[in-house]
């Protein structure tokens, strides 16, 4: 059975509410944006891995907020990267930590920009990130 456009619109409207006292639109459903992503990885080795990838033809720059934990140790950083189709430039700032839990690098492999992460310890380390991409 095909779902009509009017049904889809009615389904969307039932999850939207306008609060006139605060002038805010509230939703009861999470919306998806192709430029935003949230992810999580847990690693038990010091091998480098791709924390995230994206198509370099579609996006020019990315910003990540990464929060890591290993037992009672914590490490948070903000990462910005930009590429020219061949080379990726990366910078970290806003680093807050009580221990260095990982290092980061970036490169281009095939059609993708890769944010590479190397955990500092083979002890179970969890890396969570929020990503925002900017179109090319």
PLM regions and their residue ranges:
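Glycine-rich, low-complexity segments
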Residues: 3-53, 132-136
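Broad, structure-driven detector of short, well-ordered beta-strand segments within folded domains
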Residues: 16, 30, 77-83, 104-106
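Generic recognition of long tandem-repeat/solenoid scaffolds
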Residues: 25-27, 51, 90, 110-118
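Surface-exposed ligand/attachment interfaces on beta-rich extracellular proteins
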Residues: 37-60, 69-73, 87, 98, ...
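Beta-strand elements of well-folded, non-transmembrane domains
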Residues: 68-70, 83, 133-135
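Terminal beta-strand-rich extracellular "head" domains
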Residues: 80-100
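Low-complexity intrinsically disordered segments
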Residues: 95-136
